[in-house]
């Protein structure tokens, strides 16, 4: 794991920390920054590699509007940015968008495997899965409708999608994702606590 501390400008000095594991008090105590520094924590995710990140930022009270904008502009270069006012929410952010790409990769992997058992060639199963995921994500991004509304629009009564979605619901997909995100959040808290104790 790599840590990046970027000095934005002086005066007053401010620092952007891209290290999902360390809370701001830990960063101050373990570095030369000191207790009065204006600190912004950020949690980007791996799609930053293709300028498609979902990055969340948290600022300490010492950060002024200009410093917030400079920090955000750095992260906007690699994708979407959002702010949270409570640093504790960074653990939930880690669980959702930080670890989230792996969840989608797993779902796509499972869909590809299922398609192959139905007889589709491996490459066809892969491409159809990827394009379907891309198309659904793009529709959701470009629509003002909620995910639930979009789902209902493609779920015809008595049709194939309705039956398929019923299987997912009966299998407890919502509870499964609740446990999934809670497990990731709890692990994020454990890691931060462990680092703070060292």
Regions found by a protein language model. Give the residues of each.
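Single conserved hydrophobic/aromatic residue that forms the stacking wall/gate
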Residues: 1-23, 27
């Amino acid at each position: 794991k790599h840590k990046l501390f970027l000095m934005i400008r002086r005066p007053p000095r401010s620092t952007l920390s891209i290290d999902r594991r360390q809370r701001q008090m830990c960063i101050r105590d373990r570095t030369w920054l000191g207790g009065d520094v204006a600190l912004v924590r950020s949690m980007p995710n791996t799609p930053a590699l293709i300028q498609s990140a979902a990055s969340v930022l948290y600022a300490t009270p010492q950060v002024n509007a200009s410093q917030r904008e400079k920090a955000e502009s750095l992260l906007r270069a690699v994708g979407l940015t959002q702010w949270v006012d409570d640093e504790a929410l960074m653990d939930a952010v880690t669980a959702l968008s930080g670890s989230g790409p792996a969840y989608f990769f797993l779902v796509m992997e499972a869909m590809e495997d299922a398609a192959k058992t139905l007889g589709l060639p491996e490459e066809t199963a892969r491409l159809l899965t990827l394009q379907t995921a891309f198309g659904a994500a793009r529709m959701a991004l470009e629509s003002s409708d909620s995910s639930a509304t979009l789902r209902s629009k493609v779920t015809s009564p008595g049709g194939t999608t309705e039956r398929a979605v019923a299987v997912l619901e009966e299998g407890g997909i919502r509870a499964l994702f609740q446990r999934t995100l809670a497990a990731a959040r709890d692990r994020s808290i454990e890691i931060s606590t462990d680092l703070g104790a060292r």
